[in-house]
């Protein structure tokens, strides 16, 4: 195993050197690198401060979401038999983000954002700086999105639905306890360092090392693995995307851009070494396809996770997978219709049974597109389970009927 990791590291370093050799032109960074993963700033001057020379830029931004949600659960979908069928319903503030982004010295971009709608370590949503050695070789350090999954890498304020696919965000089911939070398919925000770049305006690569503890932890808490003492128990993640029509925007459809034609095909992989406090290691792989064509947006994505338990646990491996396809179309320049079909093997492949979750939605934009109304309805069905008990357990904590309306304001 140790020889395998050494070989992979050598191959990665070799690939990075080759990528750098393809792009030797020195170029000052431009405003397209001034990004925040919250709201799109492409082509928008807005409210900003800059020097006359343009080598320093400072842009504040904000995103506020207010939602109303109705969730109705089956009796079998409730964690307690005494709970009411209608639960987790009412009004909420999913996100209330205030941040600033910018550039300095024509080499460094930066971003800092706070989210008071969250608690604990998640109050600090992002804090990073990015050094652009050249377009094909950039280094980012701090707290930011890990390079895995189109659903998460999309700009937060430009998603097709107000809720991300459940196959990406809901935790898996295990027949035994862990020493840590049970994982989901996604890896989300984390603390770490990443090398990334764009080559020939068609190839994008991202390779990083992270804590693997997620958005809620802002401190160093990791150690070395038990089974492989030479390996730090961190998250190792990478993504490679091919964009045949040029650089792909992170939007899932925008009224600002109804005449574009962009496509992306990407593969990603991550290894969270003994992530659950030395209980299990999570290996994830993903494949994604996205296409924006004029008023159309289409995405299809699948992901697989293997949980390998440590020797002390004495448990067999468990495998899980999920996938979704979604499409959006601007019926008018301000009105976007949306459809999604989401599938989740939540209880592991050896148990059988799937959750299938179709959804329909609509987005409407007001006031120069700074105000956005999103509505959606999702149904949770189950199929292929061996017993009624398996069927009941697979849907625990997930509403049979979910309806959400959300207003979002950005600047």
Language model regions located:
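N-terminal periplasmic/intermembrane-space "pro-region" immediately following the signal or transit peptide
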Residues: 3, 19-65, 411
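Outer membrane beta-barrel transmembrane domains
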Residues: 326-328, 334-367, 372-382
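Outer membrane beta-barrel
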Residues: 46-73, 78-215, 232-247, 326-338, ...
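Outer-membrane beta-barrel "beta-signal"
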Residues: 235-247, 362, 366, 371, ...
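Gram-negative outer-membrane beta-barrel proteins
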Residues: 68-74, 118-122, 147-151, 213-217, ...
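Detector for outer-membrane/organellar transmembrane beta-barrel domains
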Residues: 239-347
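Transmembrane beta-barrel architecture of outer membranes
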Residues: 95, 124-126, 190-192, 233-237, ...
């Amino acid at each position: 195993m140790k020889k395998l990791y050494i070989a992979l590291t050598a191959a990665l370093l070799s690939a990075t050197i080759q990528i750098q050799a393809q792009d030797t032109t020195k170029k000052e960074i431009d405003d397209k690198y001034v990004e925040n993963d919250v709201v799109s700033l492409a082509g928008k001057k807005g409210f900003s401060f800059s020097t006359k020379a343009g080598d320093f830029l400072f842009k504040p931004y904000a995103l506020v979401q207010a939602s109303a949600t109705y969730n109705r659960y089956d009796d079998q979908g409730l964690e307690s038999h005494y709970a009411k069928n209608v639960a987790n319903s009412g009004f909420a503030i999913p996100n209330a983000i205030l941040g600033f982004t910018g550039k300095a010295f024509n080499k460094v971009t930066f971003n800092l954002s706070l989210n008071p709608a969250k608690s604990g370590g998640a109050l600090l949503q992002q804090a990073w700086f990015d050094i652009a050695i050249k377009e094909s070789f950039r280094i980012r350090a701090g707290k930011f999105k890990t390079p895995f999954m189109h659903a998460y890498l999309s700009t937060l304020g430009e998603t097709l639905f107000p809720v991300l696919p459940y196959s990406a965000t809901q935790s898996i089911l295990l027949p035994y306890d862990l020493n840590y939070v049970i994982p989901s398919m996604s890896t989300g925000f984390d603390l770490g360092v990443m090398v990334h770049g764009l080559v020939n305006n068609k190839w994008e690569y991202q390779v990083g090392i992270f804590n693997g503890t997620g958005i809620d932890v802002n401190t160093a808490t990791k150690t070395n693995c038990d089974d492989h003492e030479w390996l730090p128990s961190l998250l190792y993640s990478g993504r490679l995307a091919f964009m045949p029509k040029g650089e792909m925007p992170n939007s899932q459809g925008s009224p600002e851009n109804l005449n574009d034609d962009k496509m992306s095909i990407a593969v990603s992989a991550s290894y969270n070494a003994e992530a659950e406090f030395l209980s299990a290691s999570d290996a994830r792989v993903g494949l994604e396809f996205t296409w924006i064509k004029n008023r159309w947006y289409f995405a299809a994505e699948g992901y697989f996770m293997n949980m390998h338990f440590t020797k002390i646990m004495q448990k067999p491996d468990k495998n899980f997978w999920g996938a979704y396809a979604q499409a959006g179309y601007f019926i008018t320049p301000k009105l976007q219709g949306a459809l999604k079909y989401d599938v989740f093997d939540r209880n592991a492949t050896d148990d059988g049974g799937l959750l299938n979750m179709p959804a329909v939605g609509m987005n409407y934009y007001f006031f120069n597109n700074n105000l956005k109304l999103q509505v959606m309805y999702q149904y949770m069905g189950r199929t292929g389970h061996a017993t009624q008990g398996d069927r009941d357990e697979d849907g625990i904590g997930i509403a049979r009927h979910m309806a959400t309306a959300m207003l979002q304001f950005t600047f």
